[in-house]
Each structure stands twice: as structure tokens, then as C-alpha cells.
Amino acid sequence: MDFNKIGDENVVFQIFKLEMLIMSEFPSFIEEKDKLLCLNVLANLLGGIFENEDKIIPNYKEAVIAALFERLLLSSNQKSTSKSNQMIKLLNNSLAHNNGLPSQRCNHDSKLVYMSLVQNNGLPGQRSNYVCCPLCMEQHCIELLTYQLFAKWRNFPRIDFSPVLQGNRGPRFFYTCFLCNSTFLASA
């Protein structure tokens, strides 16, 4: 596994192969769009790619996802080894009882738990990240608070993702919809 390879011409294809590899291990009852959403968030956040994917034994999904999260925690929270260890323990416990998906420990939909963990330094959060996409009208959008982590893997415009104050409507943020890829402003 090589999580550090950056700038490869075939990185998009390799991420696609990574997604297909993990998707093949998801339980059949998980909806296809939810699988894709989870995996797109995961791959884009980490930029993780596999070399020698043919050597990965089937049914290693739990180890693969745990390794990806471990890499994420180490890169985004290097000063807190204890939190990384705590998160790995949480993953190990939840993966065994939740079809390979991290336990949410809150009211988040499972397809949003990945970004939730990132926004809360590797710990499940209580804050909902749902907003409604104005184009496809689905509540599956995620606040772009970690732009630097996945900008290189998607063609997002280089815009300021800090809160935007607009009159008495309160702080507003740029969001992206991971199903139709639209980017828009919405209240937190």
C-alpha cells in the first residue's frame, strides 16, 4: 500500500480501482449511491491509492478502511497520537459490528460519518452536516472544511471556504454535493 504517491498521471484511474475494490466487499443491501458517496469522500480526502491491488486478499475490507482512516488521522492530527490510537480502537470495534462502516455514535447518516470524523479530529461529532442541494434536492451535501486535503483530486474552484457573512442571515458556507458535484452557498 502506498498512501504517499502524489502527482501520478494515472491517479484518478488508480483511485477508481481502489473504489471498485472496496465496493466489491460492501454488503449487497447497501444502496449503490451510498457506497459511491462513502468511497468518493474517502478517496478524495485521503488521496490514497493502492499499488499491487491484485495482492490484496478479498474480505480485507475492514483492514483496508482502518488503514485509510489511520493514514487520515496521522496526516490531519499529527500532534495527537493518543487520539489516533483511540480512533483506531473505535474503528476496530465498530467495523466488526457495522458492516465495515465506522459506528456513528450520533444521529449522522452513515454516508456522512467519514467527513464528520475528519471535522472532529477523528472523533464522531454531534453536529449535522446536512444541507439540501438546490439542483438535485437531496440532503447529502457536506461542508467543505477540508479543502486542502482533497482539492488536488477534484476540480473544485479555488474559492474561500471560510464563513461568508451576508446580512442578518448569519454565517454561510460553501458546500458541495457529492452526487451532482454542484458547489453552492448555504447557511450552516
UniProtKB/Swiss-Prot annotation:
UniProt GO cellular component terms: cytoplasm; cytosol; nucleus
Primary location: cytoplasm
Localization per record: Cytoplasm; Nucleus
Superkingdom field: Eukaryota
Keywords: Cytoplasm, Meiosis, Nucleus
Keyword Transmembrane: no
BP GO terms, sorted: meiotic cell cycle
Role according to the record: Has a role in meiosis.
UniProt-recorded name of the protein: Meiotically up-regulated gene 94 protein
Organism, as annotated: Schizosaccharomyces pombe (strain 972 / ATCC 24843)
Classification of source organism: Eukaryota, Fungi, Dikarya, Ascomycota, Taphrinomycotina
